[in-house]
Amino acid sequence: MALIIGNKTPFVQQPPSPWTSLTKAHTQNTGSDGFLFVSFIMSNSRGYSGCTYGGQPMTLIKTQNFGGLQQRWACYGLLNPPTGNNNIVVSFSGSVFSPVSMFAVSFTGSSGAGVFA
């Protein structure tokens, strides 16, 4: 089965007030061997403590701190996420005052994706 790119959810926003988490709706495609990829970048003045989709914890795939740019980036993945419309929730380790950019993309046909490295 071929890997098929499904729904995408882009998000960029300056917090209207300090955030301790970010919640954004995303629709996971219906199909076998689903996968959800979420990436976000934010100021490195705060960290993050996790990411969930539909209440299921996602696996941290990669994180990077760009000290010179004063930004931190992370990406999370979830094999066989619940289909349909659910919330992505990114939890922060403290209040976030700076803009946060997030991008989520759904896949089907991800059989053989294996373990995150």
Predicted regions and their residues:
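Function-critical acidic carboxylates
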Residues: 1-117
